[in-house]
Structures are given as structure tokens and as C-alpha cells.
């Protein structure tokens, strides 16, 4: 079996879509090798797994394809082949290629299966002579809101015609069903987190957390999310922080890490005008790999966003051994389980109360940390990759 992974629409690896590909490829079983059709056949009466396929000498080759500029972006050391195609580098050209030339490209490269990680952005409408697998890691109804009517119709037509859709959470799956997509072909496979990067650090006893280019004085709360919309609830969190400071008189700071977006000006204004402006830090874009140390040094991770389809940041914070206080909306309760303390993001007083409890109640804090580390350990990329391959092998039998 030859599986192609489409890298178009993944922002040269600099977004969550690109990270998905990098982690997926780097966690492929090391003994997956080039497919040999004469090696064996899969028993149609069973539901085979990756282990079954390898035991029967069914050989699987995984290959990436996209523009030449991305040839080394997703290089994981796994010696995964990359096939490039000439392309003008813009989303419009990529979308046109997917609906005029990809069928011929797939046939030429003998792909039995194609995985589309950026299915909400670039996707064919027909899937001739191959098994298509769409990955949806966000709330599609939100993604399509600001797109043209013709593009919305094209993406939905592609998703209606594709054989398999993998949703990152039940919340995302339910959103897809509301858009009219067939329930039985939508499977939920949670994404993993990088446990080599996000893990509990027990040696952080300094008053200053040095995370280049910042040196952040402890104690602090951290919220990592782009300043992109009211649904991220930055302003409500700032108001909650103000109440926490008034109620406790404690020296805590609030660190807001994330790119400026359409809502940034309003958030900056509220922070600047706050009575506690000197304790509120908006540090802008923060490299993903630097979040591990930022989380590890924090009093707690706050995550008030109400429309998250995945919620990986709360898992990453849990894995770092800090309590998580987050919204009870979106996919967060599904992803967080019983480990976080949940709140109503529209209620700053409730958020402030949760912040105070996690600071003052040592038993509660210790319990949250213990539960968080155990829970986060269940989310790993090895499981994500194997579940995905098992689904593909079974569908392709």
C-alpha cells in the first residue's frame, strides 16, 4: 500500500496543520517499508491493524507531496520520500490544482491512499482510484464563515465525496454532522502531544523563568492563544485577573502569549487601561517549543476560549505538571477530562475564584497536577498514527 500525504495548505510547517504532518511522519512505525503487492493480502473477514499488516509482511510506503520549497520542511529522519510538483505559491493556485491535476498526479505516483491534513483549505471534489482521508482539526463551520460561497460549496462537496473523515474531537465531529456530512464516515482520532518537549520539570526553583527573549518573574498565570476573536475571551480573563488581584493582594502576573490578530487592538487597550497594567504582559508570538518552559514555570495555565475544536494547549500544560483552569465550552471538557478546573468564561468573578482556589488550596493544587500528568500521558502521537493507519488499512482491505 502506498500512502501519499498532501502538504499543500499547511503554511510551510509553521501552523498547526504543518505540525500535524511533522509529528505524524516522525511517529510512523520504523518498520513500515515499500509496499509489495505480491507479499500478502489482507483477510477481508477481519479488521486488520498495523501489527497484523507487518506480521503478514504487508509493506506500506508513506510519501509526502507538495511544492519543492517544502521538500525539507517535514524531514523527520525517517527517510520519507517527497515528491514535488511545479506550483505558483498561493492558495488559489493550490485549490485549482487539486481540482484539475491531482487525479493524474495520484495515478502517476501510484498512491492507493491520500491523506489531506489541510482538508478545510485545499481538497479535491472527486476521489478517483484512491482512498481519500480528510483530516479536520478545527471547527469547520467557523473556518468557512469568511470564505466565498463557491469555496464553501467546493469544500463541502469534497467532504461529502471523500471516503473517510478524521475529526480531532467529538465536538468537531458534531459540527461536521450539522453541516450535513455523513455520520458513519466521520471517525474521531485525537491528536497527540510531544512528550519529549512537554514534560514535568522539577528543577525550576528560580524566581525568574528565562525563556528567550523574555525573563518572566514568578509567580504568573499563562494563557497561550492568538488575539484573534472575542471567543478567545482575553478581555474577560483580564477582568478576572483584576478581581483576583483585588481579592488576594498577591504578586501574580498574567502572561498572554500569542500573535496579534483582528481583536488585538481592543485587548491591548483593555490591558493598558487596567489598574494592574504593570502585571499584565502581552508577549506576542511565542515559538511552540518555548511554551514548555513557559508552562512549567507558571502557577497555572488559564484557557478561557469557548470555541476550541482540539484544545492541545491544555494537554501540553498538563504534561508540564501545572494545574489547568479552563472554559467548560467547545472540546475542552472532552480533551481535558476530569483533570482541569472548569469555569464559565463569561463570568470573571467565577474565573477569579478558581484562580484564588488553585493558589491557596495546596491539596487541590496537588490533586490537579497529579491527575493532569496522568491524563495527558494518554495523548501521544504513536497512538494517533497507529489509529489512523489501522483505519486506513481496514478501509482499504
Model-flagged regions — what are they?
Residues 1-397:
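Carbohydrate transferase catalytic cores enriched for Leloir-type hexosyltransferases
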Amino acid at each position: 500500500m502506498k500512502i501519499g500525504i498532501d502538504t499543500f495548505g499547511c503554511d510551510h510547517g509553521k501552523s498547526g496543520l504543518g505540525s500535524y504532518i511533522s509529528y505524524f511522519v516522525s511517529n510512523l512505525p520504523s518498520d513500515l517499508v515499500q509496499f509489495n503487492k505480491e507479499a500478502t493480502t489482507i483477510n477481508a473477514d477481519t479488521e486488520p491493524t498495523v501489527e497484523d499488516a507487518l506480521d503478514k509482511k504487508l509493506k506500506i510506503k508513506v510519501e509526502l507531496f507538495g511544492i519543492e520549497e517544502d521538500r525539507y520542511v517535514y524531514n523527520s529522519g525517517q527517510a520519507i520520500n517527497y515528491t514535488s510538483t511545479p506550483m505558483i505559491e498561493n492558495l488559489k493556485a493550490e485549490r485549482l490544482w487539486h481540482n484539475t491535476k491531482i487525479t493524474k498526479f495520484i495515478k502517476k505516483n501510484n498512491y492507493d491512499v491520500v491523506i489531506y491534513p489541510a482538508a478545510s483549505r485545499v481538497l479535491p471534489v472527486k476521489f478517483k482510484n484512491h482512498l481519500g482521508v480528510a483530516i479536520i482539526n478545527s471547527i469547520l463551520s467557523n473556518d468557512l464563515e469568511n470564505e466565498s460561497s463557491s469555496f464553501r460549496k467546493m469544500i463541502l462537496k469534497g467532504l461529502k465525496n471523500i471516503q473517510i473523515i478524521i475529526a480531532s474531537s467529538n465536538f468537531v465531529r458534531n459540527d461536521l454532522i450539522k453541516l450535513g456530512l455523513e455520520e458513519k464516515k466521520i471517525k474521531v482520532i485525537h491528536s497527540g502531544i510531544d512528550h519529549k518537549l512537554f514534560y514535568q520539570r522539577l528543577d525550576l526553583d528560580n524566581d525568574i523563568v528565562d525563556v528567550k527573549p523574555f525573563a518572566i518573574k514568578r509567580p504568573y498565570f499563562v494563557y497561550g492563544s492568538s488575539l484573534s476573536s472575542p471567543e478567545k475571551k482575553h478581555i474577560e480573563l483580564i477582568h478576572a485577573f483584576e478581581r483576583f488581584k483585588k481579592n488576594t493582594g498577591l504578586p501574580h502576573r498574567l502572561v498572554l502569549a500569542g500573535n496579534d490578530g483582528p481583536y488585538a487592538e481592543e485587548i491591548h487597550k483593555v490591558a493598558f487601561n487596567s489598574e494592574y497594567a504593570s502585571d499584565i504582559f502581552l508577549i506576542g508570538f511565542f515559538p511552540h517549543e518555548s511554551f514548555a518552559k513557559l508552562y512549567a514555570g507558571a502557577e497555572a495555565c488559564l484557557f478561557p476560549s469557548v470555541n476550541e475544536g482540539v484544545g492541545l494547549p491544555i494537554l501540553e500544560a498538563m504534561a508540564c505538571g501545572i494545574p489547568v483552569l479552563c472554559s467548560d465550552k467547545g472540546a475542552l471538557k472532552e480533551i481535558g477530562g476530569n483533570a482541569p478546573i472548569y469555569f464559565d468564561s463569561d463570568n470573571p468573578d467565577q474565573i477569579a475564584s478558581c484562580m484564588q482556589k488553585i493558589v491557596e488550596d495546596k491539596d487541590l493544587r496537588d490533586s490537579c497536577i497529579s491527575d493532569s500528568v496522568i491524563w495527558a500521558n494518554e495523548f501521544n502521537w504513536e497512538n494517533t498514527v497507529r489509529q489512523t493507519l489501522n483505519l486506513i488499512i481496514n478501509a482499504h482491505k
